[in-house]
């Protein structure tokens, strides 16, 4: 299917088959499609509404074209979310990666610079002193040595360069805003994945089921966070061995007090890192609590905790005893040694 035909179909409201979407995505990712065609197609697709089949096909093409990170670990975990919730809160998903690694998970943390908040995973890790420009073998070595590696998206998804211009110029969310967490270059089958809109909670879980993931928690909070919130209830779609279950969780069920989002907001990567370090030093406040509840879910997703309750309790202890802080420091050293 050529780009003009695909644009015609989606603007008429017709869903593409997986085979058709695969052809279109290959043209976008290999530079065959023009910027105008890319923009027109993405907008048409958004107005129609992306289907699970279309998202699955697009993710498969991106995975195929990515620079792979090969690690001999069947239970790799990723905590990458979509970003884009405009909350300007500390980078919870990054903090969770180190708590989960301290709890025995092997973590391939996929991430990038900021989408719409003050800082993304890459910004925070750079502020901590980590090198971001590692190649696939160096990332794999960090995972082997310290249990966590950072997969900086531009290093692994070079084919994305063809879509960057149109996406930036359009300035609206498109299919690509949800593809990042679906295209981990290490193929992590376990995930805690926050999405920027509740509309995506179940479709993303269904997409990951089609892609072969094992245990995933897709989350969106009522207060808008693409994390499990301590300021509101959170909607969860749990994928576990092919079955998807929806439920809601609250901070109270884990014995945590509610907090205002303003208690978690930061203006720079350095401020985000400072809040993370406070939590990693065992200082119990809103930052500690939101990291604990999300890291607990990550431990459960990685099958390192039998229940969410056990995961949250375990994550809190890893924060209190300094294990998460030591893991962060070991990771930063590893990025500078490999």
From Swiss-Prot:
Q: Identify the enzyme class.
A: transferase
What Gene3D superfamilies does the record point to?
Nucleoside phosphorylase/phosphoribosyltransferase catalytic domain (3.40.1030.10), Transferase, Pyrimidine Nucleoside Phosphorylase, Chain C (1.20.970.10)
Pfam families, per database record: Glycos_trans_3N, Glycos_transf_3
Alphabetically list the UniProt keywords: Amino-acid biosynthesis, Aromatic amino acid biosynthesis, Glycosyltransferase, Magnesium, Metal-binding, Transferase, Tryptophan biosynthesis
Q: Record's superkingdom?
A: Bacteria
Catalytic activity entry: N-(5-phospho-beta-D-ribosyl)anthranilate + diphosphate = 5-phospho-alpha-D-ribose 1-diphosphate + anthranilate
Q: Which residues bind Mg(2+) 1?
A: 93, 227
Cofactor names from the entry are: Mg(2+)
Which Enzyme Commission number(s) are listed?
2.4.2.18
In terms of InterPro entries, this protein maps to: Anthranilate_Pribosyl_Tfrase, Glycosyl_Trfase_fam3, Glycosyl_Trfase_fam3_N_dom, Glycosyl_Trfase_fam3_N_dom_sf, Nuc_phospho_transferase
| Residues engaged in binding anthranilate 1 | 81, 112
Where 5-phospho-alpha-D-ribose 1-diphosphate binds, per the record, is at 81, 84-85, 89, 91-94, 109-117, 121
Q: Do the record's keywords include Amino-acid biosynthesis?
A: yes
Per the entry, the cofactor note is: Binds 2 magnesium ions per monomer.
- How does it associate, per the subunit comment? Homodimer.
HAMAP family to which the protein is assigned, alphabetical: TrpD
* Function text: Catalyzes the transfer of the phosphoribosyl group of 5-phosphorylribose-1-pyrophosphate (PRPP) to anthranilate to yield N-(5'-phosphoribosyl)-anthranilate (PRA).
Family of the protein in this entry: Belongs to the anthranilate phosphoribosyltransferase family.
Q: What is this protein called?
A: Anthranilate phosphoribosyltransferase
Q: What is the lineage of its organism?
A: Bacteria, Pseudomonadati, Pseudomonadota, Gammaproteobacteria, Chromatiales
């Amino acid at each position: 299917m050529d780009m003009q035909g695909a644009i015609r179909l989606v603007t008429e409201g017709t869903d593409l088959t997986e085979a058709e979407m695969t052809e279109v995505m290959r043209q976008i990712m290999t530079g065959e499609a023009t910027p105008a065609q890319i923009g027109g197609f993405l907008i048409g697709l958004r107005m129609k509404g992306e289907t699970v089949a279309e998202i699955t096909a697009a993710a498969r093409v991106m995975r195929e074209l990515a620079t792979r990170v090969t690690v001999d670990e069947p239970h790799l975990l990723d905590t990458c979310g979509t970003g884009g919730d405009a909350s300007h809160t500390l980078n919870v998903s990054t903090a969770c990666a180190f708590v989960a690694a301290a709890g025995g998970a092997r973590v391939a943390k996929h991430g990038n610079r900021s989408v719409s908040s003050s800082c993304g995973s890459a910004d925070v890790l750079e502020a901590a002193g980590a090198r971001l420009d590692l190649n696939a073998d160096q990332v794999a070595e960090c995972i082997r040595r310290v249990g966590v590696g950072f997969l900086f998206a531009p290093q692994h998804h070079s084919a994305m360069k063809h879509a960057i211009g149109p996406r930036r110029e359009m300035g609206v969310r498109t299919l690509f805003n949800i593809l990042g967490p679906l295209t981990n270059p290490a193929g992590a089958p376990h995930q805690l994945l926050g999405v920027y809109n509740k509309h995506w909670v179940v479709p993303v879980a269904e997409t990951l089921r089609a892609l072969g993931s094992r245990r995933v928690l897709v989350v969106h909070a009522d207060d808008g966070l693409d994390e499990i919130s301590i300021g509101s209830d959170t909607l969860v779609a749990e994928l576990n061995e092919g079955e998807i279950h929806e439920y809601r969780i609250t901070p109270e069920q884990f014995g945590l007090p509610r907090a205002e989002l303003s208690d978690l907001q930061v203006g720079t990567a350095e401020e985000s890192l400072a809040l993370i370090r406070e939590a990693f030093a065992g200082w119990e406040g809103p930052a500690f609590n939101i990291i604990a509840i999300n890291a607990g879910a990550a431990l459960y997703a990685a099958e390192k905790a039998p229940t969410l309750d056990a995961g949250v309790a375990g994550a809190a202890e890893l924060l209190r005893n300094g294990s998460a802080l030591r893991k962060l420091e070991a990771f930063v050293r590893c990025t500078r040694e490999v």
